[in-house]
Amino acid sequence: MTKAIQMQSTDCGSDLYDLMGEITYIIPVEDGDPNEASFLQGFARSLMDNAGIIQLINTLPSDIWELTPEGQKIRLARRMSGQASVTWRGQSPRALKRMVTPPFLPFIVLFLGREHESETYREWINAHSFPLTVVAEKGGTITYKEFSLEKLKESFLNVCDALVGQIKPDALDAAREHLRNWREPDERDLGYKVGGHNVVAPNLFSLYVAGFRDSTSGGFKKIDDGIAPYVDIIVQTTRSVLLERERIGERAANQYFRRPPSLSLFAPSIYPHFYETSLARSTFTSEEKKDILAVRRMLQRQDGYGFTIGNQRQIKAFLGGPEGDKPNPHPIILERGAELSLATQCVGTLSASELSAVIRLPNAANRTSGQVRQFVQHYHARHTTDRKRREAFRKVQSAITASVPVEFFEFIEGAKDGIRLISDAHLEWINVRGLPICVQKNITKVPVTPGNLFIEQVLPKKYIHLTTSDFEEVLILSALDKSDPISGFFDVALSAFEPHFRDKIRIREERIRNKEDLVAALNSYDGSLVIFDGHGGHEEDKPAVLQLLDESIDIWQLQRMRPRVPPVVVLSACDTHAADRNHATTANGFLAIGARTVLGSVFPIDARDAASFVARLLYRVAAFVPASHKMFNRSLNWLEIIGGMIRMQLLTDFCRRMESKGLIDRESYRAIHLVGNLAINGGDDWPYEAVVTELAKHGVDDKRAWHELRSAAANSTAISYLQLGCPETIIVHPDEGFRHEAQAKMEANQ
């Protein structure tokens, strides 16, 4: 648990600091320019070259207390609560040289790869008031050949010795005691071994943290037997991780430190434009073009976890020559392999930090883009019907669901604490027990392109701890002209709900004419929630835009301006994370400039529904969240808050549909809505099943109820809203009593 830094003065007037025990691992990134990134997914190539360093970091402690006998007793519980994450960062040399680490944060480990010259960083290393720990082939504190926990401990003890006179003596004594008490965790027997492969690497990192060290038997061999052998080892290791989580269980501290998702679905992807770029005017030779096209077709047609090679041209491109020759794969194949390795190690950092399970999906998930495109075209069509939209959604949902092996659904249905979708594919529409997963579970999505944004979003983060009073002022960025027909909907919706939250939330509205107004409004706001009210759009092959009063703006352009962005951004606008468009969405743009989580939309959203959604969200923060604190005696994370909102949206749309069709009357509407409300907000695993059961009491049979519910879902904004980023890392606590009680619970656990 992080504590505030405190100082005391010595007799000579110098200040002595407390000591922070967190360990931070740093990898220099000397090629951070996006124009130099890998062309299939957008990673810094130096990080791709150093994926092995990340693999090592994923096995290391998160702080100096974790490996003590006392720390090991609750190590796994702390990680499951997001309170002991492995922290590593890729930093450019320029950024490093501008930032000398203060003495109260001394446990820094700089990892230098083969291409890094230690002398490049010597001036920065020597600028510290303590000996920085540097791991390098030569010129560092520890070489890779001799690296071990014992060597790391020795280096940290030397750091403590150098901090005498800078850090409080009792803090140094405690740090030394922790370090001297480091013990390797007891090794445990998993009971089986698997062939090592990227598809199970994140799960193996989780199991490694839990003490299961000897879990592989060489490399994975069954690469020519279809997806079944891959699925088998994914299922096996996923089950082991989840059983370990079940063994540990919930702790009292989880009332305050809510657990992140127990399960992630991971589908690495490639920029769509890679497949669409013409080679006609390129400088490649005719043979080179044929090889590139062959590789593109292989990548595009990949269904499973490996490549299917269909002809001699593809064999030549894949192996670099005829079968039997020494393999010399095409540069694109090599680059894709390096991208996948880096992406896997980054997801492994997350799984090791949370003791969570990761299900790697076959590439079939990414091949559903054609069906998504058809549904998007239907959604945008001027003339459509309720039935046609339901049928169009059924088709795209069926395709996406079919791309997920059936063996994985037991874990998806049983997932606790939400599900994280690490994917560009629209996995949020997977059919789970008759409805899209986005209305059945609390979900958040981490985009996988561009690669450098993916890394920033997927790496573990310090939790943001808020209380309900941190939402006492909400900023609304208004970008609608008064003559716009939809400009009054926000006022109408807010005025209806304002009596319910006026004592707790104050609305601050800013009219946004241009980019400068937007940046000024953000910089002048120090609250936690900003809402954009206006129009959005995303044309094909262009960045998405928000329409301000005087101009359109691409949010990605604000990166160099570095505005202050609150942790939560809600975009009440159309197509802010549009389906069937490139990665340069407005929602991704807000993540890139610093938002912790963004609520975006994959389709156009009805202005009345959007205004009502925002008004109900403010009411939820003001009234439901405090009531939930009291009812369940625990805090809530933002993932739970918005997940409940989306489910309530579908419930309302469904009940209105049933009433409009004459299937229920007003009295039945109230009764059914109440049952659904209690099921959703009471934490029922499958609340809509409770609603269907209640409908039967009012004369609606199950078959008709489910038919109408699926139709309501296909036509509801509930399937358009999408949480992106890391909402699970924002925890909203009660205003009263949290800090003292949370500290007491944490100490009791320790």
Features from the language model and the residues they span:
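Short, low-complexity, polar/charged sequence segments that are solvent-exposed and flexible
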Residues: 44-48, 439-442, 494-498, 527-529, ...
